[in-house]
Amino acid sequence: MNLANLQLFAHKKGGGSTSNGRDSQAKRLGAKAADGQTVSGGSILYRQRGTHIYPGVNVGRGGDDTLFAKVEGVVRFERKGRDKKQVSVYPVAK
């Protein structure tokens, strides 16, 4: 009588590991107000890292380079020299 020594193994290999599979959250950078749009004082106009766009008339720059309106008015994106851009807010006469 032959007794077979039957041994069962896993039929799939282990899952292994990878160093991928992560990504950072989107930071929602960019324009928050359009050219010609009316904004109130304190409104965020442009979120950025560094100064892609410079602050113009009645526009302030926050600690993280965010541009915001200092007064209520109309937004204007303008050229500053040959290769720079700026955003300004001009008050509307009532």
From Swiss-Prot:
Any one GO CC term of the record? cytosolic large ribosomal subunit
* Keyword Ribonucleoprotein assigned: yes
Q: Is-annotated flag, keyword Ribosomal protein?
A: yes
What parts of the sequence cross the membrane? Answer: none
Q: Which InterPro entries match?
A: Ribosomal_bL27, Ribosomal_bL27_CS
What the entry lists under Pfam families is as follows: Ribosomal_L27 (PF01016)
Disordered: annotated span? 11-34
Protein's GO biological process: translation
What PTM annotation applies here?
The N-terminus is cleaved by ribosomal processing cysteine protease Prp.
Q: Which UniProt keywords apply?
A: Ribonucleoprotein, Ribosomal protein
GO molecular function term, any single one? structural constituent of ribosome
- Which Gene3D superfamilies does this UniProt record tie to the protein? 2.40.50.100
Which residues are propeptide? 1-9
**NCBIfam families (alphabetical):** L27
Q: Which HAMAP family match?
A: Ribosomal_bL27
What does the similarity note say? Belongs to the bacterial ribosomal protein bL27 family.
Q: What is this protein called?
A: Large ribosomal subunit protein bL27
Q: Which species is listed as the source?
A: Streptococcus pyogenes serotype M3 (strain ATCC BAA-595 / MGAS315)
Q: Which gene encodes it?
A: rpmA
